[in-house]
A protein has these predicted regions:
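A conserved catalytic-core segment of Leloir-type glycosyltransferases
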Residues: 35-133
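Acidic anion/phosphate-binding donor-loop and adjacent secondary structure
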Residues: 175-178, 222-238
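Conserved donor-binding/catalytic core segment of Leloir-type glycosyltransferases
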Residues: 198, 240-266
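Carbohydrate-associated surface elements
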Residues: 203, 221
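Nucleotide-activated donor-binding/catalytic signature segment of Leloir-type glycosyltransferases, i.e.
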Residues: 289-309
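Short alpha-helical donor nucleotide-sugar binding micro-motif in glycosyltransferases
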Residues: 308-309, 316-321
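Aromatic "clamp/platform" in nucleotide-sugar-dependent glycosyltransferases that forms part
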Residues: 329
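Short hydrophobic beta-strand element within catalytic cores of glycosyltransferases
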Residues: 346-349
């Protein structure tokens, strides 16, 4: 079976759990043996693992015809996409997009992140998806999270192929109920057009009025530890050799994750004992507010903000921790507690997490 998949991030360049989940899903599908996966990403770097899938960099897909020679195409984008694919995609431009800002190859640029003009990038991504869907041969479409639902819908309209959307979370989870109408509309539209809705838990579609017949819970998991990570865990100090205890929060420092509860709990604990350090690893829109909150509570001497972590850094942080805490206000199915448990670290999670 040939799968045309739309994603937003992918290791080693990840910004959160979506990239990690996308990697695990694609690798698991590829292991089935009869799957041919083509993953579309807004702005891949070229160093992603291509061993089990094909990657199309959407920022190298032309939407405006430019007469460019092969040598120049090879020089500009050869490390990410073959010139043959570029020219084949160029032959499938389906409309006049000269009103769009494009580069010297006729391509739309993407940040590959979550910029202020995210809605514009999502719309542009769906435009490019129309070119890809006309050029590629595939049996089914798989769209990851709301960012790629419009692309998945467009690909379905072009090809007539079934659409599977993967709901990793909804705006109800991310916003504590203060739903962005635009985001909700995109999510609802994606679910309405989908032939199958994959959810990480059964609760994420309650507000979207979907038929249970097309909704399936597909829970997250983690892969067995790689040798490099096993070596990190092997050097974890026994509890009796540790002078201080470390309690860790690791994730996006944003409303959904409940970071203020972690800071407030730390302040309460430190009223009883000072032999504990608290680590809030990650980044997000509430990071500065949490630094200020820790300062107001007078606990900055026992509180650390190491910033965003990835790869082995994550496992090094777990192995220096005695307890992992995930105080999420809403968490469909967090991966980080599973990673912590792999390292032998006890996890405390909120009851509404998964």
């Amino acid at each position: 079976m040939k799968v045309l998949m739309f994603g937003w991030e992918f290791p080693p360049h990840i910004l959160g759990g979506l990239g990690t989940a996308s990697y695990g899903i694609t690798k698991g599908l590829a292991a089935q043996g009869d799957m041919d996966i083509t993953l579309c990403l807004p702005n891949p770097h070229g160093d992603e693992d291509h061993s089990f899938l094909n990657i199309i960099p959407m920022n190298n897909v032309p939407v405006v015809w430019h007469d460019v020679n092969r040598e120049y195409v090879e020089q500009r984008i050869g490390h990410r996409m073959s010139p043959d694919l570029y020219y084949d995609l160029r032959n499938h431009i389906y409309a006049d997009f000269n009103y769009r800002y494009t580069d010297d190859l006729g391509c739309i640029n993407f940040s590959g992140r979550y910029p202020d003009n995210l809605n514009e990038e999502i719309n542009n991504y769906s435009i490019v998806a129309g070119v890809v869907a006309r050029q590629q041969q595939f049996d089914i479409i798989h769209a990851h999270d709301w960012l790629t639902y419009p692309a998945g819908i467009h690909a379905k309209q072009v090809s007539g192929k079934p659409l599977v959307i993967h709901v990793h979370a909804t705006d109800f989870d991310r916003s504590r109920g203060h739903v962005n109408p635009t985001v909700y509309g995109i999510e609802k539209d994606g679910m309405d057009h989908a032939d199958c809705i994959m959810c990480v838990s059964e609760t994420v579609i309650n507000h979207y009025h979907q038929s249970p017949d097309k909704c399936f819970a597909v829970h997250n998991a983690v892969y067995p530890l790689e040798p490099g990570k096993e070596e990190i865990i092997a050097h974890r100090l026994p509890l009796k050799e540790r002078k201080e205890r470390v309690v860790t929060f690791l994730g996006r420092i944003t409303m959904q994750k409940g970071p203020e509860y972690f800071v407030e709990a730390a302040a309460l604990v430190l009223q009883r004992t000072r032999h504990i350090r608290f680590c809030m690893a990650g980044s997000g829109d509430m990071m500065n507010a949490m630094i200020e909150l820790a300062a107001r509570r007078g606990i900055t001497d026992r509180f650390h903000f190491p910033g965003f972590m990835k790869g082995n850094q994550v496992y090094e942080a777990y192995c220096k921790s005695d307890v992992y805490v995930m105080p999420s206000v809403s968490e469909p199915f967090g991966i980080s507690p599973l990673e912590a448990m792999q390292c032998g670290v006890p996890s405390i999670i909120s009851k509404q997490s998964g």
